[in-house]
A protein has these predicted regions:
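N-terminal, polar/charged subdomain of small-to-medium soluble alpha/beta proteins
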Residues: 2-73
Length: 73
């Protein structure tokens, strides 16, 4: 899916980050990982947050995001 803004075109990808401590850290980790292979990241939209639970305890926070980056033709 590509989104046009002005004279630019942006590509959107979905990523999920995980963290043992918080949703914010999970989102930060997802952006850091994505930025290693995607150039010119512009917007991160959080679409879902959940937790993984084992034996009645939270073991991971997960943040699902849509990331947009400038399309390079």
């Amino acid at each position: 899916m590509a989104k046009k803004s002005g004279d630019s075109v942006y590509k959107i990808v979905e990523v999920v980050g995980t963290s043992p401590t918080s949703w914010e850290e999970a989102g930060r980790r997802a952006i850091q990982a994505a930025s290693k292979t995607l150039r010119d990241l512009r917007i991160a939209e959080v679409v879902k947050q959940d937790m993984a639970i084992e034996n009645g305890k939270v073991v991971a926070y997960r943040t699902r995001m849509l990331l947009s980056y400038k399309y390079q033709a």
